[in-house]
């Protein structure tokens, strides 16, 4: 399964929630892709907030091979979407990739914060 986001900023947040304060994400690259809309890109319209039900749904969708990609709401920002892309789907070969580009995190994102939201 290939995990992607509809925006680079969301991809950054999705990564940062998994980085502890003593870790520093290094050597990251990003790319953009054009995903063919046929066969249909699936759009998930449910709510899966717990990790286990989300995992089961994703595994079932991937095994079904009904679509190349599925848009799913971000748990961090539910109004925005992540995209799961199934690399074993026949249409995966039709995805057009840009050249990878270096991504550097702004150091302010990686320091501890005492701000109260």
Regions flagged by a language model, labelled:
Residues 23-117:
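Active-site and NAD+-binding cores of ADP-ribose-processing enzymes
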Residues 1-14, 18, 84-88:
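Extended catalytic/binding region for NAD+/ADP-ribose chemistry, centered on the ART fold
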């Amino acid at each position: 399964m290939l995990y992607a986001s509809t925006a680079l900023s969301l991809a950054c947040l999705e990564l940062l929630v998994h980085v502890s304060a003593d870790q520093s994400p290094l050597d990251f690259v990003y790319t953009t892709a054009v995903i063919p809309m046929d066969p249909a890109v699936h759009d998930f319209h449910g709510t899966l907030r717990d990790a286990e039900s989300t995992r089961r749904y994703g595994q079932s969708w991937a095994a079904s091979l009904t679509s190349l990609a599925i848009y799913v709401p971000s748990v961090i920002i539910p109004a925005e979407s992540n995209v799961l892309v199934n690399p074993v789907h026949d249409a995966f070969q039709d995805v057009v990739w840009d050249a990878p580009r270096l991504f550097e995190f702004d150091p302010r994102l990686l320091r501890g914060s005492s701000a109260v939201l």
